[in-house]
């Protein structure tokens, strides 16, 4: 009975190891479950030429109509090759986890010895018993690593969706702003041409004419910058959507969506972020995995090589010999202290990283929500106060012009001012939708938040260019 214990224990370990195999495609389903609530379309992985052709046909169909924000996200998740490459990491890690759960291959040795006329043949079959006994623990560690990779890939999916939505907002706003900058340039050109003709007729002095010419030059510069921003925003959107060739002729809506009636009120936003942010979950899993790695290091600290073998010797002059042998590593020079110290430091490092991730998550979501509320208030102020006021001023100026109380130059200058206010309103609406995308991302993962000072300087420069 004692002889049967070792084979039975090895058989039990083998059964446990066989149960630890990973079902192909299970990781993709897990990523889908993590992202489906935040990205409506389901993820697909292109593994063949037929899959690529099917994706291309789907994208072509979606591009027949002007691209909305949700459609842009759908195309990006379907067609972005960088995301497809990242999704392949799931299959790679699944294969590595399955490989780690497999039984170690046994070793075989053969020897031939001669002594006079005697020939002795030695055959041995051995297996790494230390690796076999730690196989369940190693399999659980690999499964934890697979879960971490799943969350990392899910984070990449959500980041791409947020970036595509923000790029769409910027592209539509840049297109709408370019249209108004054309109006500013046309008004400035008409004013400059009228000033030139009136100077030729002797009704204008050189200073007034040069002033109008300066307005026209500034408007032309503002138009060139608007065209540059529009091209850059469109190209960035095309990159994120994975578009090229004939697909670059995609159409966008004429304007951004209207401002919502009221902003979202989220008093428990920090708790919500900590509960559902994937980077916080990944940091927690990393700390747990490091703790299990520390346990494995402690188990194998002194003996990391422990082999059991069966031996069979035959000779032409002696009876056959059978038996077993055990070989193990003697910890004479390396007691495993350095590996244990490294594992402990890695564990403490993972704890600090998890705490830092949670602290940063709280701060990011507070900042994102503050930007969201401030951007909403600014956009609403433009919509309800500044734009109607500029429109009323323009109406009064037109009445004064019809009554010959002001001249055409004052009317054109007021038209430029009104268009500039509308353009500023577009930028405020753009900033709101960008802030909303940042807030949505900050609730589920790392968000790329803008620098308020830089944004303010840029807005001021654009407004000045329009006058």
What is each PLM-predicted segment?
Residues 20-43, 74-131, 234-243, 270-338, ...:
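A small-residue-enriched
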Residues 87, 140-143, 206-214, 408-416:
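Short, charged, amphipathic alpha-helical segments
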Residues 189, 218-245, 353, 358, ...:
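Short segments within alpha-helical structural elements
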Residues 205, 361, 368, 404-408:
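Alpha-helical heptad-repeat coiled-coil segments that mediate oligomerization/polymerization in large
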Residues 126-133, 137-143:
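Short, Lys/Arg-rich amphipathic alpha-helical interaction segments
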Residues 20, 135-137, 151-272, 368-371, ...:
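Periplasmic alpha-helical coiled-coil/stalk elements that build and connect Gram-negative outer-membrane
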């Amino acid at each position: 009975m004692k002889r049967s214990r070792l084979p039975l224990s090895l058989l039990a370990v083998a059964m446990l190891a066989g149960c630890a195999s990973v079902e192909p495609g299970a990781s993709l389903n897990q990523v889908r479950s993590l992202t489906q609530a935040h990205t409506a379309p389901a993820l697909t992985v292109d593994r063949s030429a037929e899959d690529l052709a099917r994706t291309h046909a789907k994208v072509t169909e979606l591009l027949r109509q002007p691209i909305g924000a949700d459609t842009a996200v759908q195309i990006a998740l379907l067609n972005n090759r960088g995301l497809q490459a990242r999704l392949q990491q799931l299959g790679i890690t699944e294969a590595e986890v399955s490989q780690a759960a497999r039984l170690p291959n046994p070793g075989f040795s053969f020897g031939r010895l001669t002594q006079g006329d005697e020939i002795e043949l030695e055959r041995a079959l051995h297996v790494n018993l230390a690796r076999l006994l730690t196989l369940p623990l190693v399999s659980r560690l690999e499964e934890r690593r697979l879960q971490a990779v799943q969350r990392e890939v899910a984070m990449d999916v959500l980041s791409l969706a947020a970036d595509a939505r923000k790029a769409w907002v910027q592209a539509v706003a840049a297109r709408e702003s370019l249209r108004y900058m054309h109006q500013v340039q046309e008004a400035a050109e008409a004013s400059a041409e009228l000033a030139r003709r009136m100077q030729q007729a002797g009704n204008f002095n050189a200073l007034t004419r040069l002033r109008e010419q300066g307005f026209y030059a500034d408007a032309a510069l503002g138009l060139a910058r608007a065209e540059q921003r529009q091209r850059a925003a469109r190209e960035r959107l095309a990159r994120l959507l994975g578009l090229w060739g004939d697909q670059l002729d995609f159409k966008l809506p004429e304007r951004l969506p209207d401002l919502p009636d009221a902003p979202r009120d989220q008093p428990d936003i920090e708790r919500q972020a900590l509960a559902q942010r994937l980077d916080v979950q990944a940091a927690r899993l990393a700390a747990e995995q490091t703790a299990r790695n520390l346990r494995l290091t402690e188990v194998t600290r002194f003996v990391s090589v422990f082999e059991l073998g069966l031996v069979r010797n035959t000779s032409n002059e002696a009876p056959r010999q059978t038996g077993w042998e055990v070989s193990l590593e003697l910890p004479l020079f390396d007691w495993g202290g350095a590996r244990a110290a490294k594992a402990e430091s890695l564990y403490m490092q993972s704890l600090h990283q998890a705490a830092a991730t949670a602290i940063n998550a709280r701060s990011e979501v507070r900042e994102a929500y503050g930007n969201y509320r401030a951007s909403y208030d600014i956009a609403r102020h433009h919509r309800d106060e500044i734009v109607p006021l500029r429109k009323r001023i323009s109406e009064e100026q037109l009445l004064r012009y019809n009554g010959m109380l002001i001249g055409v130059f004052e009317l054109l200058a007021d038209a430029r001012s009104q268009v500039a206010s509308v353009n500023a309103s577009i930028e405020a609406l753009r900033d709101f939708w960008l802030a909303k995308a940042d807030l949505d991302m900050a609730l589920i993962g790392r968000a790329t938040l803008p620098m308020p000072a830089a944004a303010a300087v840029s807005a001021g420069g654009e407004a000045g260019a329009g006058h």
